Curated annotation (Swiss-Prot):
It comes from Blochmanniella pennsylvanica (strain BPEN). The gene is aroK. GO terms for cellular component: cytosol. Disulfide bonds: none annotated. Monomer. This is Shikimate kinase. Pfam families: SKI (PF01202).
Length: 187
């Protein structure tokens, strides 16, 4: 996790960026957090869908993961330049070093953690997640989630200002923890 808190870090704290694996609750928590703090909410996946006029799965299938990640990187770069926003990112967005730098440099980064068991429960009926669609068809969703966790968890940890588990806590509790820990970090 990041340790240094300079004057620039103090200025960037008016943005909150939520990172973590699929099913961690980034979008749900982000909306509630934005509502409570009276800030504008963005979801990078929804932005991609709005701008392309297609759902994430279609974009992923037609353009491929590499092109999807390029598009995601550009959208996150644009959104993180705004001030006073909450941004829920896609689980794989941290694969881009440019995105990691932008998130880290331009906002307070919250790593929402969850176990693979909770991910399986929370995403079992979600047909919009391209990586899960292909794995569930072959019956190895758990294996895929383990591979993704091994690849991505160190990247989440690298840029996180704080980490919060969403496994056994309701949305309101997580939102309040984020608000409290954000205030403490800016002191």
């Amino acid at each position: 996790m990041k340790k240094s808190f300079s004057y620039n870090n103090m200025l960037k704290k008016n943005n909150i960026f939520l990172i973590g694996p699929m099913g961690a609750g980034k979008s749900t928590i982000g909306r509630q957090l934005a509502n409570q703090l009276n800030m504008e909410f963005f979801d990078s996946d929804q932005e991609i869908e709005t701008r392309t006029g297609a759902n994430i799965s279609w974009v992923f299938d037609v353009e491929g993961e590499e092109r999807f990640r390029d598009r995601e990187e550009k959208i996150i770069d644009e959104l993180t330049k705004k001030q006073g926003i909450i941004l829920a990112t896609g689980g794989g967005s941290v694969k881009s070093h440019i995105t990691r730098n932008n998130l880290s440099d331009r906002g307070f980064v919250v790593y929402l953690e969850t176990t693979i068991e909770k991910q399986l429960i929370r995403t079992q009926h979600d047909k919009r997640r391209p990586l899960l669609r292909s794995s569930s068809a072959s019956g190895n969703t758990r294996d895929l989630l383990q591979v993704l966790a091994k690849e991505r968890n160190p990247l989440y940890e690298e840029i996180a200002d704080i980490r919060i588990s969403t496994d056994e806590q309701n949305v309101r509790v997580v939102v309040n923890k984020i608000i409290i820990l954000r205030k403490k970090s800016s002191l």
